[in-house]
From Swiss-Prot:
The keyword Transmembrane helix does not apply. Transmembrane segments: none annotated. The modification N-acetylalanine is found at A2. It comes from Colobus guereza. It is found in: Cytoplasm; Nucleus. This is Tripartite motif-containing protein 5. GO terms for cellular component: nucleus; P-body. The gene is TRIM5. A zinc finger (RING-type) spans 15-60. The modification Phosphoserine is found at S87. Residues 283-495 form the B30.2/SPRY domain. InterPro entries: B30.2/SPRY (IPR001870), B30.2/SPRY_sf (IPR043136), Butyrophylin_SPRY (IPR003879), ConA-like_dom_sf (IPR013320), SPRY_dom (IPR003877), TRIM/RBCC (IPR050143), Znf-RING_euk (IPR027370), Znf_B-box (IPR000315).
């Protein structure tokens, strides 16, 4: 009887929207009550889809928001109702077999279930070992107590892992924010020439932050869920251990399986000593280099090419572009002229028309899209010795060549003097070029006896510098397109 009354009362204080006991109940003037959250959400939905019309979800009578009032009386009833425990009849159902209606007195060892005497005689449990619940209660009490201690230990580990992952997440955030600040500060002085480097580095850090924090956030969520799972499991076991024998053994198979199947998952971490460490560029060196390039450009001279009968290079009418003929055709047509196809390289060189005998001189050469070239300065051709290539046309400073070159599209090198064992072969030294130049600047300081090469594409970084050059006679700009038919172009000072 009392149970039926409680059911009726519960129906009266149930929210018509969420069908749960009212939470912070609000009443409309029509008399219907709703959870504050439910009626608020309904109000917003009505405003969105029904052009501002507000009506009771139950009786559809219109209402105004200012007429909604908190219902303290209903709230008190709900609070009291939540405190009401199960009736004796409802509690009695737990002690009886759901299938046979008999009292649950036995425990099946194989299935780890509490059963009645009719269950024991059924086909399902035939041949199983059954005991009175009191006979196995102590055994399972010990098992669950041991499991509880193990779970508490794992719970502590889970909480520590959760705390560690939170700390690591915060640490990563601070570290990356610090790096971002450093990047911004380091690039401040060279904003005009380092914008792209700054942007690139910041994008890398943003990507690193996004990837790592996303992974750590995912791990954090997993650790929170794992910790919550542990808490619920511990709470369940504590409740069983503090309750009756029936509560201890009811569903014990399921909880034991959960414990046996449970493994403590550890979060994915990112060791800081393995991360990509940001290295700020040598800003002072870059600034000095930029200033040096700005300084040498004051000595820019308008260089043009000087056609001659020695070179087989193709010079354009504007005398600024030089390209190579097809080497195979030239070799077949004039095979007697060259000792080998390899010597073809020396016969495609061309000089600039300007003779340098003193002072400072600078010019730039466009080498974009070329896979091979040689450029620098030369002490001049010797037409009478044209065929004596080994002595007069190999690229060594002692023979009057201060040049650098490219071959196979990626191999940059400088030509130095050969050894005493190979006097007629230059010593080719590889150059480290991070950004391939589309334009190369050449600067000659005749009095200082230096020839410098700048990567204009990379903010004027110095590619190489010849020192202590022996300028015993006039030198000329030198260009050689090698066997690549794409032209080299002398840039005008206005470009």
């Amino acid at each position: 009887m009392a149970s039926g009354i409680l059911v009726n009362i519960k129906e009266e204080v149930t929210c018509p929207i969420c069908l749960e006991l009212l939470t912070e109940p609000l009443s409309l003037h029509c008399g219907h009550s709703f959870c504050q959250a439910c009626i608020t959400a309904n109000h917003k939905k009505s405003m969105l889809y029904k052009e501002g019309e507000r009506s009771c979800p139950v009786c559809r009578i219109s209402y105004q928001p200012e007429n909604i009032r908190p219902n303290r009386h209903v709230a008190n009833i709900v609070e009291k109702l939540r405190e009401v425990k199960l009736s004796p009849e409802e509690g009695q159902k737990v002690d009886h077999c759901a299938r046979h209606g008999e009292k649950l007195l036995l425990f099946c060892q194989e299935d780890r279930k509490v059963i009645c005497w009719l269950c024991e005689r059924s086909q399902e449990h035939r041949g199983h070992h059954t005991f009175l619940m009191e006979e196995v209660a102590q055994e399972y009490h010990v098992k669950l107590q041991t499991a509880l201690e193990m779970l508490r230990q794992k719970q502590q580990e889970a909480e520590k892992l959760e705390a560690d992952i939170r700390e690591e997440k915060a640490s990563w955030k601070i570290q990356i924010d610090y790096d971002k600040t450093n990047v911004l500060a380091d690039f401040e002085q060279l904003r005009e020439i380092l914008d792209w480097e700054e942007s690139n580095e910041l994008q890398n850090l943003e990507k690193e932050e996004e990837d790592i924090l996303k992974s750590l956030t995912k791990s954090e969520t997993e650790m929170v869920q794992q910790t919550q799972y542990m808490r619920e499991l511990v709470s369940d076991l504590e409740h069983r251990l503090q309750g009756s024998v029936m509560e201890l053994l009811q569903g014990v198979d399921g909880i034991i399986k959960r414990i046996e199947d449970m493994t403590l998952k550890k979060p994915k971490t990112f060791p800081k000593n393995q991360r990509r460490v940001f290295r700020a560029p040598d800003l002072k060196g870059m600034l000095d280099m930029f200033r040096e390039l700005t300084d040498v450009r004051r000595y820019w001279v308008d260089v043009t090419l000087a056609p001659n009968n020695i070179s087989h290079a193709v010079i354009a009418e504007d005398k600024r572009r030089v390209s190579s003929p097809n080497p195979q055709i030239m070799y077949r047509a004039q095979g007697t002229l060259f000792q080998s196809l390899k010597n073809f390289i020396y016969c495609t060189g061309v000089l600039g028309s300007q003779s340098i005998t003193s002072g400072k001189h600078y010019w730039e050469v466009d080498v974009s899209k070329k896979s091979a070239w040689i450029l620098g300065v030369c002490a001049g051709f010797q037409p009478d010795a044209m065929y004596n290539i080994e002595q007069n046309e190999n690229y060594q400073p002692k023979y009057g060549y201060w040049v650098i070159g490219l071959q196979e599209g990626v191999k940059y090198s400088v030509f130095q003097d050969g050894s005493s064992h190979t006097p007629f072969a230059p010593f080719i030294v590889p150059l480290s070029v991070i950004i391939c130049p589309d334009r190369v600047g050449v600067f000659v300081d005749y009095e200082a006896c230096t020839v410098s090469f700048f990567n204009i594409t990379n903010h004027g970084f110095l590619i190489y510098k010849f020192s202590q050059c022996s300028f015993s006679k006039p030198v000329f700009p030198y260009l050689n397109p090698r066997k690549c038919t794409v032209p080299m172009t002398l840039c005008s000072p206005s470009s």
